[in-house]
């Protein structure tokens, strides 16, 4: 089992870059799991118990890095 709880923790703290990084890490873990099993004999399920939205407010200029806030 792989859990991505740090994605949720980052969203609670409004840490956009950390939430994105943790999502990438979860994706990499799922890719590794897929590589380790026989997919004709194994079911891999990725799910969530809730979600968060990510809002970038303010008056950023074009080309600004939203994760550098």
Task: Give the residues covered by each predicted segment.
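A post-motif C-terminal structural segment
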Residues: 1-69
């Amino acid at each position: 089992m792989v859990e991505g709880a740090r994605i949720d923790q980052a969203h609670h703290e409004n840490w956009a870059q950390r939430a994105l990084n943790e999502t990438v890490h979860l994706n990499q873990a799922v890719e590794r799991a897929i590589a380790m099993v026989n997919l004709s004999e194994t079911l891999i399920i990725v799910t969530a118990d809730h979600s968060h939205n990510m809002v970038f407010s303010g008056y950023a200029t074009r080309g600004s890095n939203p994760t550098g806030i």
